[in-house]
Amino acid sequence: MSRSQSPSLNDGLSTSNSRHSSSHSRFSLHKAFPQLSGNASFNGTSPKTKLPSRFSGGSNPPYMDSLKEQESSSSSSRSNFRRANYVNPGRIRSSGLKYSLQAPKELSSIDKINDPASRSIVISGKNHLGLYRFREDYGKLELTLDLFNIDQKAASLRTTTRKTSTISDVKAGFHNYKNYVAICGTSTSVSIYDINRANLVDGPASMVLSKHTRSINSVDFNMAQTSLLISGSQDGCIKVWDLRSSQGRKNKSDLTINSGSDSVRDVKWMPTYDFPNNDDVVAGPSNRSHRFASIHDSGLLLTYDLRQPSQAEKRINAHSGPGLCLSWHPTLDYIMTGGRDGKCCLWNMGSKPLNPASFQNIHHNSSFSTSAASSFTQGFSANSVTNFINSPEAVVNTAHPLTKLKFRPSAIPEVFDSVIALSSLGENSDVSLYSLSRSYIPKNVLTTNSPSCGFVWWNENLIFNIDKQNMVTGWDLGKEPTVLDNLPKNKIAWRDIEGDGLVFLAQDKGGYESGGPDGMSVSTETRNFSQSRLSTTTMSNLFPSHTMRQNSSVSSFPALNTHSNSGANLGDRPSLPRTVTSYSKGAYTQTYGSYNTHSSHHNSAASASASSIATELGSEHVLSPRMISLDLPHILNSIRSAKIENYAKKPSRPGSAAFKDSPVEVFKFLSRELKFSYMHDRNFNKPENLTDQDDLAQSVDDNDLKSHLITRFGFSENNTWTKFIKKSNSPEKDAAVENGTKVNEASIEKVTNSPNDTGSDELSSISKLSTEPKKSDLAERNITAIRQRVKHFIELVSMCDHNAEIYLYIDDLSNFKIWMMMRDSLLWELKQITDSLETDGGSLLSESLLVNPDVTRHSNGARKQSMASDYSSFSTSEVGSTTGVQALPEFRGPHSLSTPPRATTSFGAKEPSSLKKRESTIDENLSETEIEAKGLPKEDIKNLRNQISKHQIGDEVAIEDEEEDKFEEKSSAGTDASNKNIPIIPSERKVSFVDQFINSMRSPKTLHGDFETDGSRMANSASTKRSSQPSFSSSLAGLITRRLSDQSPKTKPKDLIYSKSSGSIAKNSSDLFDFQNVEGNNSPRVLTQKSKISMLLKGLKKSETAPPWDASRLIKKIFEQSVATGNVLLTISIILLFQTTFKVTSTTVVKNALSEFINILHKYELFEIAANLLKFCPWDDILEAGNGQCTVRIYCERCKKLLVNESSKEKFTEEWKRTGRQEVMKRFGYWYCDNCSKRNTLCVLCEQPLKKLTFCVLNCGHEGHPECFKKWFMNEEMSECPSGCSGFLL
């Protein structure tokens, strides 16, 4: 059928590119969306962060006879006024809006009347079918005819009245049927209206075609054979009606195609446009008027030929969800489909592949897929031309269901120069126009009052739209600004993926055509980035290659490069955020190792990887946008190295230079090597059938590790916790070790039977009580608790040491020192536990001492040698330590000073009972509250107070003489004690910074028995402000005890006073000294003075703060510093290692931090580390976060139905409840089907059901158990499939 040709309107329209200066972009993401009332004046709005709304239904490509008309050059003042009122909230004036009208009723669908002279559009809605006429000279749009509400007089003469349902689609006919309008809706019929018969008595209704059994979704007229009408319904049937035949009058379709139970969402005839000057356009197929396409709820795209309707011409799984709309290309053999999965896919329906030249100038964004020519969808091979239909030529990911999309009606020789208009379900009110040559940025965005219900192209420059607020708008695209015009020309931002540098955009903005004047030229696009340093990720973005992008974590490790090209493509549906639209050309999925970070101002971040066909044919011509990045850490390090010559000459560790310059590689290296959880190597439950020999074999490695730590850190083998570690698996050896950790009962009996001890009866009763089982059980529980705590601290120490070595390997000294500080603080904490066992430890390790801890004072015990061990033997640090410092045998640690000293004199156990009574009386003088609590008479209280006030210290010489006597007494006592047990002083021990902190208030000279001078004592007493604070009670007590035992005639009482805050302590101490001096008893005086001072400090210890090297305090401070500085790895390490021990922060912070860290690991493709982190997480609720995030549906291989097996599940559950045997549930599973009572695929080797993990041979698809395949392929070294087919192991 011949058609007249009309010139294009390109020359008649003038393009306005004027812009108003504004600091805001039209597409600002921070602008609110104002709801506008429906009136004649229309104000546009800017797009929001949410994406456009979409509705179901399709539309036929408009008829192009309207191109015959010329656009009038004149316009009225009213239209100019209306255009002038259109102002975006971004303050950029738009001149594209030409028509606007508020419709009187609800609107749902729109189409054009294909009569050039009418200049009308038809709009349908609920109880509304109106004909709207627009006038270009006045810019006016008005309702001229409502086919449902015509002359009432004529309507009263009708014999019948037809009721219409909610209209879902409306279409207008062509040529001889150009006055026909077809509507369909929720009813089962298609109604045909003749607009030329509106004023007749019979009315405009011409016929009703009601052969469908369910609601009809789409109708369409054939452009060539204009009498043919096609309809698609929810009943899964496609019906073709010939309006000329008598079948339509009989309510019968001429052709019915049943697609099964799959509902038809949209159906379209292939268009047959006749464009002017169409000689250069590739001629379409000869059967264009016979072809039509349909898209279904299953996502299936079908094409048919009327001459062979019994079989589909093409079958394409276009979408993973329901397909909602489709549109044929005006001239080429392509179809664009949209679905609920948010994808807009371009499919080549021809019989030959694309021309390679068509890919040469495609504007390509590879910020999503870093290897621009490496994306192949599953099942597609570029080597086989016949399989190219399995992959879409282009994919626009909108993240919202697409319900309306239409090609721009124009003669385009290149498919990627085509423009498509689309709208989607959602709250965003706009119609987006994309050019496939630059689909990551929309060409135009037509903002409306509310979400769009439908649109139609009048010609290539005029588009009409209807929205939910019943507003009809018309847009002149020649005068509408493009998105590129409103985007900022200069942009700088931090790199999202690495966060270590800046990103600049090239100033050449490009255009929307592949070969236009604004398009990028391949010959001139030479990229030289030698002036700026680019990371491996940026280089792979800028220079696409045929090889798949290597995982960035592998690039720095040559040993892993052999696996870099073996990655497979990811799944079909990448997770997309709600506010991001991504575009991928020629790739249905993202490439392995790619990432999504790009975001445009229109929220349509476009990603594109090269077409799968272009990969083989012309990928070297595919270009990506230029992105220049600066690696700031590298630049700063270079500047620093230039200024510090020695730093540049510093030798680096072998292997660290390969990745230490890349922050991303350093992060990945640390994430792999650092230890985050002490539960990683633990076994949750020991098998019941594990024998003692197996247990012994399993514990060998642990014992060796702990023994290695004991040797490495210089721990004494006489400590209690080392005995716990070296506990043997033999019952005899265990008994021996336990006996060694308890106080020797023989020594207790010896003390008990001493003739000089007046309290022998009391100790005898204690010895009897120690045999009671109740006390023995309590001691065992205490020992077990201490053993577990010691073991836990050893694990933490080893992990801190490991993490410190990792940071030292990459020359990160700051973090290395931090981990060493935490390690040494844990060693100090470990020493406190051992000291408590050695001093107060008798009460934990001996049943007798559980009753009376003071018995320690009267016994030498079997642990005297370990009590004499020095602090440096516990916490020697290899880094930052000093040499040449000897250990102090008499030093017992801070906690030991809070209890009465033990075994310091040879006559400590021979203390007369009278002295004990007087000692208890002096104790009552410490606190009036304590005195009253003990119930002493007030007269005794008064006498004691008088004695204390009467004998105040008034002369320093008296104290010097007193201390000389004390030194003589102690020296004699030390001589007697040395005859019994001579401590061995370790030589050349190293001490850590914790030793230096604790021992800073005593001179190293005392380690060799030298005497201090007055000046040295004064310097030590006032060395630091921290050393003078009462919070360090243990160190203060240690200094007081040591000085009281020193042989120094020059010691003054003011040495005991450290600050004003501790004046009361010193005063009480001096009172005690003077009272004992008056009594004149020198022998017990030394012990009594030391005891009272220790008791005084012990009472104040609860209200004092911990020392700065306390593990809990130090780790919390480091955690706060790491959070403030943004040290992610250190923060997460502290949380996972120390949260359960020291309660570093709140549980909410822990959960949020771990969630964000897991997201970061996923972003850097460290999935295995993230899985291990969840697996060994000590919190169950966080562990559950990695489960239940996906649902796998399994279908029966026989009946093709979903495997639910509810009946068998109920059956086995009832049997379990009835019998109480839980193993009954093992018979339940999804390896069989309740519907057909058949089993699924059996193992190809053992022919047993596949109940759990299953392996599959990719070549042939045969499945089997992992054990069977391992035995077949690995043990027996077979390469063929066990079934004997042609499959083989790659």
From Swiss-Prot:
Q: What SUPFAM superfamilies does the database record attribute to this sequence?
A: WD40 repeat-like
What Pfam families does the database record attribute to this sequence? WD40 (PF00400), zf-RING_16 (PF17120)
Q: Which GO terms describe its molecular function?
A: zinc ion binding
Q: Coiled-coil regions in this chain?
A: none
Q: Where in the cell is it found?
A: Vacuole
Q: Where is the stretch described as Disordered?
A: 1-87, 732-774, 856-924, 960-984, 1004-1034
Question: For bias kind Polar residues, which ranges apply?
Answer: 1-13, 36-48, 750-770, 858-885, 896-907, 972-981, 1018-1034
The WD repeats are at: 162-203, 211-251, 259-314, 318-357, 397-444, 447-485, 778-819, 821-842, 1079-1119, 1166-1205
Highest taxon above the source species = Eukaryota
**Does Repeat appear among the keywords?**
yes
Keywords from the named record = Metal-binding, Repeat, Vacuole, WD repeat, Zinc, Zinc-finger
* UniProt family annotation: Belongs to the WD repeat RTC1 family.
Q: Function of this protein?
A: May be involved in a process influencing telomere capping.
UniProt-listed PANTHER family = GATOR COMPLEX PROTEIN WDR24
Task: State the protein's name.
Answer: Restriction of telomere capping protein 1
